[in-house]
Regions:
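Accessory beta-strand-rich segments of carbohydrate-active enzymes
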Residues: 37, 64-169, 199-200, 356-357, ...
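Extended substrate-binding grooves/exosites of carbohydrate-active enzymes
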Residues: 51-59, 100, 134, 139, ...
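Extended acidic/polar, glycine-enriched regions
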Residues: 120-124, 193-286
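Surface beta-strand/loop "capping" patches
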Residues: 163-200, 606-640
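Beta-strand-rich binding/interaction modules
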Residues: 187-227, 237, 632-654, 677-684
Length: 698
């Protein structure tokens, strides 16, 4: 599939033909080629998606300011309604067409349409977009532990409409909303909503056709309705139907997707078409037994993920998303927290098709000060509304997140003043009610890091509370077991509880061979400690079946300008060398930012979650040297039933089962090197193998 055009219409058709072709009365083109300048003097050619922090984002001080993008497009019929559709312009954007300002959008991650009809002319037109990623105390995020990149980091489209069309200004990117107020194994009720515009100077009679299409393309349901629309007017279309025996969307086991399509006709002439993928499912959270999908227990276990990549920042392409989701599928996760802001729509399309359940959230992060203005809270509501309107149809989304860690740093006099807990409680209640008015069916909650110790936090108006826990990393030194003790207290206070973050910094190129030295080290971030951290947390998670979802922090390393840690490398555990490339990074990822190195813990979780293939993986494999006279403690992550270990071709041990609670951590008996360079091989019962080489440390 060449590409999915996310706005307007026939997703399957558009992917197969030229983006600027005539599509049943709807003309659209992706605007990919732009010129870019930071100073308005020197210009360079760039391709959208583009972030002007793609290179300097991984540094001590990345550029925060404005920059201008400009391009040209041709209009053949200036009387027709035209829209620019931005899938994300960070962090705020002023849009001009032929020098006329047509939009001032505040928020860097949600899609928005701009009606440019009054500003265009027949022939060549110029569009200019001024992006600005400076801190703005009235726009979220104000402060956060991730970079606030700037630019047109998501695609941009130009769309020309017929005289009557489905409005892009009411129901987001797909121009229609598909609600399922009742889903049961034997019956599904569906409500389809869209707004039909008539821009002509006469009343018209149109036919709106609604279709439900099976995954194989066959027609499951169809209905036509005649609608009279007055001149220069609109019509709120709503169609409800009930179908029995539908195929449910059942997570990673069976992510079955239907297509809902609406077509607009005047006589036999089709004027417009819009469609969206939908998946029918029902679910609930249980305070004692966890998450249920379609009536059955379905524990959600997975990872969090930023929209970020080395050399691109937030400007990922569809191929980048496909690669990342292949990695998620390999991992075997059935849950994703897409943090800390709405990601590009294509990311949710991937989750839909793979059956991965998602929490997505607005970037209200860290800051709620006593001097916060009403404009700040208005922006929070605006971004929530845009997120829900644009992403509503995705079956993968079961959780809307309102905020993250409103109890930590970032609240000071240089920003909005000191922390205002009363405002958090009050504004959370208002935001919750607003989100529920937009979507009464999904769960709405928050991600806290205070262990609900703030007065009033136990009374937050939420459907669920998630905790970000770093016992043994940021606090409770050398006491990883404090994680479950804290969670037990939180669970008793809150009922429905999740873990939205847990993790430790891991430099995959920093190692120690001595078990006594496997401790937290701010400069080194030993991989061995990261392994121990995740192993301990998972053992504790196994004892907390009431957790609805857990998400390890985080799938990929990502840059943070203010961080300087985990930058000392060692492949022998004795000599260490500074690696500047590891600075200014949050390295809690299971995979490095460039996607080139899967850390040990990636294979730990793969062994736990991926049941479709056998995993056999030596840990500490990037430790290349070891003292000859010391005991070597080889450890393997594997979901095999038996493992046989060989040293230099000779069998030294055979284990039946790992002998511990996770069933995937295999610790072999101590042994010692026999030559200057020993080879170790482990073989599973089905023949799957892994091999490492260790040289004598001199």
């Amino acid at each position: 599939m060449r590409r999915n055009i996310l706005f307007a219409a026939i997703l399957a058709m558009i992917s197969a033909i030229s983006a600027n072709a005539q599509i049943r009365g709807l003309r659209q083109v992706e605007l990919k080629d732009w010129q870019f300048s930071k100073d308005g003097i020197s210009w360079e050619d760039v391709t959208i998606p583009h972030s002007y922090n793609a290179e300097d984002g991984h540094s001590k001080a990345y550029y925060r300011g404005d920059a201008t993008y400009k391009t040209e497009f041709r209009v053949n019929d200036a009387k027709a309604d035209h829209f620019l559709v931005f899938e994300g312009a960070a962090q705020k954007a002023i849009v001009k067409v032929n020098g006329v300002q047509v939009a001032d959008h505040r928020g860097g991650y949600t899609a928005f349409p701009v009606n440019i009809t009054e500003a265009i002319k027949k022939g060549i037109n110029e569009v200019e977009v001024i992006c600005d990623n400076r801190r703005d105390l009235d726009i979220i995020p104000v402060e956060s532990d991730f970079n606030k990149n700037g630019g047109l980091h998501n695609p941009v489209f130009l769309v020309q409409m017929e005289k009557a069309y489905f409005s892009p200004e009411s129901y987001g990117l797909y121009r229609l909303r598909v609600e399922a107020p009742e889903v049961a194994p034997n019956k599904v009720a569906t409500v389809v909503k869209t707004k039909v515009m008539n821009t002509s100077n006469r009343g018209i009679t149109v036919n709106v056709r609604t279709q439900l299409i099976e995954a194989d393309g066959s027609l499951g349901y169809q209905a036509d309705r005649k609608v009279d629309i007055k001149a220069f007017s609109d019509y709120d279309y709503r169609h409800e139907f009930v179908v029995s025996g539908l195929h449910l969307w059942n997570g990673v086991k069976d992510p079955y997707l239907y297509t809902v399509r609406v077509e607009l006709f005047e006589g036999k002439r089709m004027l417009d078409i819009a469609e969206t993928k939908v998946g029918y499912r029902y679910y609930h959270m249980d305070p004692e037994n966890g998450f249920y999908l379609n009536g059955k227990p379905y524990p959600l276990r997975g990872v969090a993920m930023h929209q970020d990549m080395d050399g691109k920042a937030t400007a990922l392409t569809h191929d980048d998303y496909r690669r990342d989701y292949r990695m998620i599928k390999e991992l075997g996760a059935n849950f994703l927290r897409l943090a800390h802001y709405p990601h590009n729509d294509f990311s949710y399309q991937q989750a839909d098709s793979l059956g991965i359940i998602v929490q997505t959230e607005i970037p209200w992060v860290n800051v709620c000060g006593v001097n916060a203005r009403q404009a700040y809270f208005n922006n929070i509501h605006d971004q929530m509304e845009e997120m829900i309107n644009n992403l509503f149809n995705h079956p993968s989304i079961c959780f809307w997140g309102m905020w993250n860690e409103l109890d930590s740093w970032g609240n000071n006099d240089s920003l909005q003043g000191g922390f205002d807990a009363d405002a958090v409680i009050y504004q959370t209640g208002k935001l919750y009610e607003f989100a529920k008015s937009l979507d009464p069916w999904r769960n709405v909650g928050v991600s806290d890091d205070s262990a609900v110790k703030r007065p009033g936090y136990t009374d937050l108006k939420v459907d669920y509370l998630s905790e970000n826990r770093y016992n043994g990393w940021y606090y409770d030194a050398d006491n990883l077991d404090a994680f479950s003790k804290d969670m037990e207290v939180i669970h008793k206070k809150m009922g429905v509880t999740n873990v939205s973050e847990y993790g430790a910094g891991i430099n995959p190129f920093s190692h120690v061979w001595d078990p006594a030295r496997v401790k937290k080290d701010d400069a080194c971030h030993f991989e061995e400690f990261g392994n121990m951290f995740h192993e301990s947390y998972w053992r504790q998670i196994l004892k907390m079946p009431w957790l609805n979802f857990t998400s390890a922090w985080v799938l990929f390393d990502f840059p943070v300008s203010g961080r300087q840690e985990g930058y000392m490398d060692s492949d022998n555990g004795e000599t260490f060398k500074e690696n500047p490339a590891r600075k200014h990074m949050n390295d809690k990822g299971l995979v490095t930012r460039d996607r080139q190195t899967k850390k040990d813990v990636f294979y730990f979780y793969k062994s736990l979650w991926n049941k479709s293939e056998t995993t056999v993986y030596f840990t500490s494999r990037r430790l290349k040297y070891f003292p000859a006279g010391e005991d070597l403690h080889l450890k393997v992550y594997s979901n095999a039933k038996t493992l046989t270990l060989y040293q230099n071709g000779r069998q030294v041990e055979r284990m039946k089962g790992s002998g511990e609670s996770t069933r995937v951590i295999w610790q072999f008996a101590p042994l010692r090197l026999k030559t200057d360079q020993d080879t170790f091989k482990v073989v599973a019962d089905d023949g799957t193998t892994d091999e490492i080489t260790l040289s004598r440390l001199r």
